[in-house]
Amino acid sequence: MKFDFRRVDQLPRLAWCATLTRGHDSVVVHHGPWVETRDDCFFEAAWDGDFRAGRFDEAATMLGTGARIDGDRIVFSTATDTDFYLFSVASGDTLIVSNSLAFAMVQGKTSPDIRHPYYLYDFFALRRTGLTRDPRRLRTADGKRLNVHMYQRFAVNQRLDIEARAMSHQPLPVSFDSHVATVRMTMAAVFENAAHPGRRYPFTPITMISRGYDSTAVSALAAKLGCRHAITFSTGELGYDDNGADNAARLGLSVTTSKQFDFQRLPGHPEAEFCASNPSGSGMLIAGLSQQLEGRILLKGDSGDFVWSLSEIDAARDLRRPQIRALATASMNEFRLRTGTLIFDVPGIGAIHSTAIHALSSSPEMRPWSIGGTYDRPIPRRIAEEAGLSRDAFGQEKMYGANLAGDEDTLKPETVADFDRFYAAANVPWSFRQRHRYLRRDTLTRPVDALLEYLRDTPGAAKLYKRFAPWLMNVTAHRANDWRRLSPYLYLFHWGFDQTKARYEL
């Protein structure tokens, strides 16, 4: 097998799309200008291993994606977190693989199915069921097979046979010190790889920080490893001030403070690429930071909600997230491909061992760092306090930094108007347009809410919750927010694709 690289400077910097044809040993790869290419591999990635060796497909932690020749096969590698995927479209004698859902659809000559508004819940189902159902198929307008590959390495030969490859993992944590040592060593290795002088385009770290547990702990670790700059937002989703600037200063970090809705000042429809990445589009608050994030590793703490949680429900195997209700980071993919940004979800290091990490959080060793209440995470608290932050400086109240796409107060007025035109002209099923189909589902939402709340709060019922919650949530189109008034905005994914596809038309 061999690569036929075709650089296209007009593509987003980190985007790539590989075309494999049955019986041919040459794989055509169209790619943006920042994708690193070698005779035997290509990647837009940093990993916890030697850069020159290029064995990212053996790494336990990998930011970004890539592919490498292994004899008579091409091995494709996804990111090792659960927010960024590879997408494949199979049609006849051709297989398309890309790190962009829009790119895969355009080159696969397909598009979202306008008869299917529920892509949001397809992605929720992917996260809620984890590795127990991978890859997951998405519907397309013409019925072509489009798969989403999460936390996966897979090999493809000339016959287009696909073979799953084993993933590498970090060691099982047995104590706080061993867990944090693994996280710290992994971060250091990734930073070294990302800054290697052999790169045409190196990456340097920048960290998100708020007053919450996870981003504060991540920033404390990053500061000790040479990270010098942080980003914070001054207002949370519900009007709370979640500004982490004071803590950033205490950690020795310079900080850029942005208001949550600054992206609304941008021209055009900056929300579109977020909606095209993931139907929630809720990571759009970073749209106004594109210049600050060029050539950066953006450090985030999102998966701390699960990995560092004390809730037994969150201690799920196979990277399942039974009660996940937000997909903010997953909606940032098109943005990061365009700006040239790698995203590092630090609590996700070793997340495959979430049951062991949960046991550690609940252990006697960690009790001095447990403050009680519903918002209590001993591991990130200990990390931050041992870095010099006071107990009352963070982790006091859960706030939400992500925006919910589909709210007229969130989207730009110009975007709302453009979406309304798209929705009015689209061949949306009559039953959905009249909301009959949605309301039929919604009649189940309240009793399902009551059942899930009972299972969540009943001692000993966590196993039942983890088993049945993902299925119940998706059958009822369950969402934390009131989708009865937002249901047309489930079509933001279709609109986002329509707005974004031109960047991938070669």
Give the residues covered by each predicted segment.
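ATP-dependent adenylate-handling active sites, centered on carboxylate activation for C-N bond formation
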Residues: 158, 165-387, 401-414, 459-463, ...
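Cysteine-centered catalytic environments shared across enzyme families
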Residues: 1-263
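Membrane-proximal basic amphipathic "stem/tether" segments
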Residues: 1-25, 434-506
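PAPS-dependent sulfotransferase catalytic core
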Residues: 312-313, 391-463
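Charge-dense polyanion-binding interfaces
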Residues: 102-118, 127, 371-391, 432
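Long, acidic, intrinsically disordered low-complexity segments
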Residues: 33-35, 45-49, 53, 322-337, ...
